[in-house]
Amino acid sequence: MALGKQAKTLTKSQVDAVTAFLLSRRNGLRDQTVFLLSVRAGLRAKEIANLKWSMIMTPEGEVGDAIHLTNAASKGRSGREIPLNKQLRENLIKLLMAAQQDRHFHPALSYVVMTQRSAHTSPQAVVNMFKRWYNDIGLLGCSSHSGRRTFITNAARKISTVGGSLRDVQMLAGHSSLAVTQRYIDGDDEARKKIVDVI
């Protein structure tokens, strides 16, 4: 993605607004979970569409503590393990309970994101969902990649506070190099203003 064409990142208040907005809609739990998979786990549209319950569930049939994204579900060899954010995990538990009511549900085969017409949605359908949501809420310049960029930017800003490095952010993002990860990270004007007085 060229630098001038990158999707915008979301502020905390925008994330909160989208989260609340989606929950108020007809397929609120599913839609909010799709959004959280982007903004709290950094998944691409393709990865959200290809995410199966088997990548999230423990052998006991419960939602685990991480997403075990396979290479087949990802872009190239971008399979990885992503620890689950608390809010996202709670949503997945509720979504799993609803999915298990469907007589066609099978933990190894069923996809997390389904529509009324299909048991497996396409990456383009996920892209279209995000476009519709952002248009409905009035967020210009945002796309299905905005949540992923927000996740990567926030992780990069906070990773050192938990003893990690940009290499950990790279691994969470599933990037082949640090250079790719760095292109995703938004700068912070306030931080740049403050740092010159600290050094």
Segment roles from a protein language model:
Residues 1-16, 77-85:
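DNA breakage-rejoining catalytic core of tyrosine-based enzymes
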Residues 12-41:
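Basic, Lys/Arg- and aromatic-enriched nucleic-acid-binding interface segment
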Residues 26-29, 79, 119-125, 140-146:
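N-terminal core-binding DNA-recognition domain of tyrosine site-specific recombinases/integrases
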Residues 34, 46-51, 169:
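Alpha-helix N-cap/helix-start motif at helix boundaries, enriched for small hydrophobics
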Residues 36, 40, 150-175, 183:
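C-terminal catalytic core of tyrosine-transesterase DNA break-rejoin enzymes
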Residues 50-88:
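Conserved tyrosine-mediated DNA breakage-rejoining catalytic core shared by Y-recombinases
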Residues 73, 173-198:
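Catalytic-site neighborhood detector that most strongly recognizes the C-terminal catalytic loop/helix
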Residues 73-93, 108-131:
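C-terminal catalytic core of Y-nucleophile DNA break-rejoin enzymes
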